[in-house]
């Protein structure tokens, strides 16, 4: 799909159908099903859960071939919206697993209950959690939480794995496929609004 074809679809397509048929279905041209199985096996081993208790979807530019939104880099520069996927681009994975979600949620709940104040200030972690999404970059930074730390250890190791191309791999954890689907639809609606402003 060319960038012009993608923009045309985002302007006119039924976005729920687009999410179901394009984003949540089919393979990524940049991350193979064998590589996905390797990630699944690694997570299952680390967290002592069954592989079939999770699903993994490639999302973002590694699925569509283009990054839909402007992105700020660590240096403060901005990468343009609809930039093509490049060999050095991150691989974004959505991990869908009620079991794994509850394992990490339970650890966060114990941490919150051990805090001296209530409600515990979850920061932006809670803002995303209400959408059924645990964002690892918002895990508590000043607490040693084993299951949360395990997440970073797993994805750090995966990012340096030659079988996965030694490129940055990021994982976001969703409670269900419906939670991921709703988030993707919301993002595409925002993308459509941005495109309409440009026309």
Name what the model sees in each region.
Residues 1-89, 96-199:
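Catalytic core of pol beta-like nucleotidyltransferases
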């Amino acid at each position: 799909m060319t960038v012009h074809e993608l923009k045309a679809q985002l302007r006119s397509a039924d976005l729920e159908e687009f999410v179901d048929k394009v984003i949540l279905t089919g393979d990524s041209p940049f991350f193979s099903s064998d590589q996905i199985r390797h990630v699944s096996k690694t997570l299952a081993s680390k967290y002592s859960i069954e592989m079939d208790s999770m699903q993994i979807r490639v999302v973002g530019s590694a699925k569509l071939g283009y990054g839909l939104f402007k992105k700020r880099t660590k240096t403060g520069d901005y990468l343009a919206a609809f930039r093509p996927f490049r060999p050095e681009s991150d691989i974004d994975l959505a991990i869908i697993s009620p079991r794994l979600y509850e394992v990490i949620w339970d650890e966060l709940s114990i941490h919150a209950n051990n805090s001296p104040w209530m409600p515990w200030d979850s920061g932006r972690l809670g803002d995303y959690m209400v959408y059924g999404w645990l964002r690892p970059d918002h895990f508590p930074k000043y607490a040693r939480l084993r299951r949360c730390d395990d997440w970073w250890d797993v994805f750090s190791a995966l990012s340096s794995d030659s079988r996965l191309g030694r490129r940055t791999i990021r994982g976001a954890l969703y409670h269900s496929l419906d939670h991921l689907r709703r988030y993707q639809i919301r993002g595409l609606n925002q993308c459509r609004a941005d495109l309409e402003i440009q026309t």
